[in-house]
A protein has these predicted regions:
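Acidic, metal-coordinating catalytic segment for phosphate/diphosphate chemistry
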Residues: 78-172
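DNA-contacting surface of Y-family translesion DNA polymerases
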Residues: 1-103
Length: 172
């Protein structure tokens, strides 16, 4: 079969995501799922910043024990690549899904950042509360680039295997 449509080059991705298969070995506690979510968001937010992108939509993907799937999404008021903001959105979505997870079990958790924009095309907001984690994110990104992804990590992720990392195409 041939697709008659022309190939579009130079078009940027509209979303990026990552997921983790959990298997059916044992039930997952909410705390364990939270740690899995932290690892996914941390890795994906770093990838988002490395691509010089920001996102407005966070989508949580789930696969249950019966192999059915569900997604939950939230659109942020402004585009961001801030790890803490994205993690809060992901945690809120996971909290909404917890009753389904408790009754149906879970075999996969994934997170997708959508509605992407170039980071220089977004109007910056003034941080009136003085609390911005942009400096922390930038510093951690530089440490990871220079010394590897396991040089510095969140305390909750210490001693945990984060799964295999697959090579990725550039996020242009």
């Amino acid at each position: 079969n041939r697709d008659p449509r022309r190939v579009e080059v130079g078009r940027r991705r509209r979303s990026m995501g990552t997921q983790r298969a959990l298997g059916r070995r044992r039930p997952r506690s909410p705390e364990t799922l939270d740690v899995d979510l932290i690892a996914l968001v941390d890795r994906l937010a770093r990838r988002l910043r490395n691509a010089h992108r920001v996102c407005r939509t966070v989508t949580l993907r789930l696969r249950f024990d019966d192999l059915s799937r569900a997604t939950r999404s939230h659109t942020l008021p402004e585009a961001t690549a801030d790890t803490v903001t994205l993690l809060h959105a992901g945690r809120a979505l996971l909290a909404i899904a917890m009753p389904d997870i408790a009754t149906r079990g879970i075999t996969l958790i994934g997170i997708t950042f959508g509605n992407l924009f170039a980071d220089d095309a977004v109007q910056l907001a003034l941080p009136f509360d003085g609390a911005s984690s942009e400096a922390i994110d930038t510093t951690l990104d530089r440490v990871h680039e220079r010394f590897g992804s396991s040089a510095v990590t969140r305390g909750v992720l210490l001693g945990r295997h984060q799964g295999l990392q697959v090579p990725l195409l550039p996020d242009r």
